[in-house]
């Protein structure tokens, strides 16, 4: 058993997770104190309550559950979430409501942090960003929302207005600079403005690109190489349509520049049409940091988009891009790293950002992830319980249940 130093002198209520299985096969107790894991020991070795025993804590029985670092969502569009049913009202209240509901849906699946791109400029101005920032505030303590300002044009006659609005967005509280150079008449000029603004405010960059033009991608990598706190490109689906030699060259350039890639195995997003998926295996083989996100959440791009990180990991594993442990890491550890969040391990001293899923192995969890318990900052913030029942086979004859089809004699 290992213990971590207490973060404060004040005693806080604890949460004991009893009998959880870890991915290495161990069955353990995990005691949480505030936002961190306080202790991990063999099953039955830990007690709930404060370290001095002055107060009782809460105990949750996790026998039959696999305990994992919680996923994070690295590429969402909460301002466009849940719009597949028709044109949204688009006012601040409507966007805030949908953004809140979308973030809660993703939290229910296990994501305790969400990076959301938010469109600015054109008709909506900064209203959508204002709404998502309000949703972020309302969700504090449940899920962490990180916003990326997504301007449309940054060059030409409209460029000055776009750059001014991007600056205002960062002053409002946007946590990163985004955009789509592919849709601007001057992609290099667009990228230069984004990188300059990000450097001025000291924020990361997260750009949309199909990555289907090797020359353009090479220029982007050269411009953004080595920038801190980091540059992410996504969904890079066009890379998958390029010849293998071109993919290898592009991947090597991205790796050398320290640029991460956010793939969207579940579908596209509202900025770029989907034409395939980023070649995750080839990118990772070249040393590129890759994460996987959801993209569209019930919008016109993907009306059935669910925002489930475990589904993204399932698709990566089932398509042969990664084995299950690595696929899960792409939606958890790698996603957190891309967003700029601290690492999570089921070990003492690490953040208490956890997901418990009924199952015994990662492969089983990715296949049948029904019942889930989500823990954020040491507190259970969501619980999903699924019950499957089958009728007794003998009952079928008594009730004369119909068959699936009837054939004429």
Where are the language model's segments positioned?
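His/Asp/Glu-enriched, well-ordered alpha-helical/loop segment
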Residues: 204, 228-229, 277-357
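Active-site mouth loops of central-metabolism enzymes
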Residues: 85-97, 146-160, 180-182
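Active-site core of metal-dependent hydrolases
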Residues: 151-157, 171-275
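Alpha-helix-loop-beta-strand connector modules within alpha/beta enzyme cores
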Residues: 126-148, 200-207, 226
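Active-site microenvironment of metallo-dependent hydrolases
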Residues: 1-38, 46-50, 107, 314, ...
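Alpha-helical scaffold segments that flank or form the walls of functional sites
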Residues: 65-67, 71-73, 82-117, 122-140, ...
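Divalent metal-coordination and catalytic microenvironments
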Residues: 20, 35, 64, 75, ...
């Amino acid at each position: 058993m290992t213990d971590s130093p207490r973060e404060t002198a004040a005693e806080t209520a604890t949460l004991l997770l009893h009998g959880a299985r870890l991915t290495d096969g161990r069955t353990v107790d995990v005691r949480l104190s505030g936002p961190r894991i306080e202790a991990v020991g063999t099953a039955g070795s830990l007690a709930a309550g404060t370290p001095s025993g002055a107060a009782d804590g809460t105990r949750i029985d996790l026998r039959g559950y696999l305990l994992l670092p919680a996923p994070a969502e690295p590429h969402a569009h909460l301002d466009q979430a849940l719009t597949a049913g028709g044109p949204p009202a688009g006012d601040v209240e409507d966007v805030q409501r949908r953004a809140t509901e979308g973030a809660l849906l993703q939290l229910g699946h296990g994501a305790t942090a969400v990076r959301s791109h938010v469109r600015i400029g054109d008709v909506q101005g900064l209203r959508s960003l204002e709404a998502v920032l309000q949703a972020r505030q309302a969700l504090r303590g449940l899920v962490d929302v990180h916003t990326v300002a997504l301007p449309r044009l940054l060059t030409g006659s409209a460029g000055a207005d776009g750059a001014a609005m991007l600056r205002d967005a960062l002053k409002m509280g946007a946590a990163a600079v985004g955009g789509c150079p592919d849709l601007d008449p001057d992609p290099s000029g667009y990228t230069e403005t984004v990188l300059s603004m990000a450097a001025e405010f000291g924020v990361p960059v997260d750009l949309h690109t199909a990555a289907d033009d090797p020359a353009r991608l090479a220029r982007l990598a050269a411009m953004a190489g080595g920038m801190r706190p980091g540059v992410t490109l996504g969904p890079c689906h066009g890379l998958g349509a390029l010849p293998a030699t071109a993919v290898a060259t592009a991947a090597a350039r991205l790796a050398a520049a320290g640029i991460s890639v956010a793939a969207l195995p579940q579908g596209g997003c509202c900025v770029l049409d989907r034409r395939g998926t980023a070649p995750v295996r080839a990118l990772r083989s070249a040393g590129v940091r890759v994460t996987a996100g959801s993209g569209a959440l019930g919008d016109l791009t993907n009306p059935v988009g669910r925002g489930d990180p475990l589904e993204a990991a399932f698709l990566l594993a089932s398509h042969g891009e990664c084995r299950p442990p690595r696929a899960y890491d792409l939606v958890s550890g790698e996603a957190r790293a891309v967003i700029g969040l601290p690492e999570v391990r089921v070990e003492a001293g690490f953040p208490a950002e956890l997901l418990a899923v009924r199952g015994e192995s990662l492969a089983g969890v990715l296949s049948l992830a029904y019942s889930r318990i989500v823990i954020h900052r040491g507190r259970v913030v969501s619980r999903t319980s699924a019950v499957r029942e089958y009728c007794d086979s003998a009952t079928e004859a008594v009730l004369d249940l119909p068959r699936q089809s009837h054939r004429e004699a």
